[in-house]
Amino acid sequence: MSTILETRGLTHVYGAGTPFERVALDHVDIQINKGEILGVIGHTGSGKSTLIQHLNGLLQPSEGEVLLDGKSIWDAKGKCARETRFRVGLVFQYPEYQLFEETIARDIAYGPTNMSLPQAEIDARVRESMEAVGLAPELADQSPFALSGGQKRRVAIAGVIAMRPDVLVLDEPTAGLDPAGRDEIFELVRNYHAQSGATILIVSHSMEDISQIADRLLVMDHARVLFCDTPREVFSHADEIVAAGLDIPMITKVMIELKKRGYDVDTSVYTVAQAMDALRACRKKGGAH
């Protein structure tokens, strides 16, 4: 699988040279594969939000570099390549608070308009993006501020999707939503990924949620990468995950408890289906020992 985004020795220091100096990223090396869904997990202050702001050039590294398709996104004069902002789309946490246009269509059209596209192309992208996030066409001329919180979030996501980024970065996309709202957003992401084939990064604090959708998990701890692997491999290090201030899925907890009680089960599982398979395998082997 080819790499679309990469960081090499990426370091970011806030307040460098002052009494308030803080290292937010400490020589981070990651490779993000084209077409994958990567979950980014970490406790508050772990560096995950700083990391994603580097991926589309909102922040400039103190050291190291970010490469898009093998090329640094920063030139020798310290300028970020303009195309980076269009190719790596970033949806901030609580994006509904960033809506500002009079109508939904105009808000979604803001990004494509800045790409200097023909009006016909902009209109087509607005329609396609609304459909992708489940917004009815008749809402196009309505005010985004008249929508529910969940619908506003869909508008904000549609505004980034309309630029057709190669990489879509979502910072805590389900924050503040009820369980039904969270399920809807994750379903939206799954559908968009299936239709577009785009690379997607989802920042979350919930292992339970993110493990259900991600191909790999990037676990941040104290400005460094703790793990970057499949969910199953990551959850095989449950003690280290918990030590980093994170939780593990309930299914994984149950399997670990069964292991402690003498049952020969796989403790790296994290879905109900995987747990059922593990229990059947345990039963065939004779159960507890």
Summary of predicted features, one role per range:
Residues 164:
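Conserved catalytic motifs of ABC-family nucleotide-binding domains
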Residues 143-147, 151:
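Conserved ABC ATPase signature
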Residues 120-138:
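Conserved ABC ATPase "signature" region
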Residues 222-223:
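Conserved ABC ATPase "signature" C-loop
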Residues 65-83:
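ABC ATPase NBD Q-loop/coupling interface
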Residues 168-171:
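Catalytic Walker B motif of ABC-type/P-loop ATPase nucleotide-binding domains
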Residues 56:
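Helix-to-loop junction immediately C-terminal to a conserved catalytic motif
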